[in-house]
Structures are given as structure tokens and as C-alpha cells.
Amino acid sequence: RTGGFSRTDEALKANAIHARQIAKQHGCAMFYMSQLSADAENKVVLNQAMMEGSRTGKAAEADLMILIAKNPPVEGQEEEDTMRHLNLVKNKLSGWHGIIHCNLEYKTARYVV
């Protein structure tokens, strides 16, 4: 459902604009979550072109974009790999772009460097 929009990407962009307006109105941070497309599967280095749906509309409204990747699966590996890669692909706040490699502590839901 696209809520009256002719295309899904238009609806997603409108949602991102609305979220940004709420954040500005209340002077707070707004977290907008989205999934990546199949292009990102099994990749550690990600970019905003891998976002599902509205690649440019959602990105245009963001001040900071963090895309989270995990290591590709290893054949025969039974234990879940907790290594995660935080790709900062857009950063209007400090300007720094890059990847932070860390571990996911799933019991506490924290990323630890």
C-alpha cells in the first residue's frame, strides 16, 4: 500500500520528510529504519544505493546514515558470527565517512568495538 502515491519510492520519501519535520518541530533525533536490497547480501562494504525502495528520497532527508552489515556465511560454521560492520555512508554532522568494525552482544543488544 502506498497511501495514495503512485509509486512506493514516493511514499517512502514522504515518510522520511514527515519524520524529519517531526524531529525539527520537537528538537529531537529521529531514527528512521529501512532494510537494504538483495544487492547488499553477503557484503561488508555497503553504500546508500543498496537501500530498498527509495534510494535517493530517503537518503536526501537523512543527516546521518548507518548501514549495518555482517560477515558472509562460512560453509560448515555452526555458531552465529557476531561481527558487524557499521558503514557510515552519509554524515552531515561531522563529515566522517567510513566503517566501524564491532561485535554484536546479542544478550544486551549492544555493538562493542
Task: List the predicted regions and their residue ranges.
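Conserved P-loop NTPase
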Residues: 64, 70-113
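P-loop NTPase motor core
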Residues: 1-85
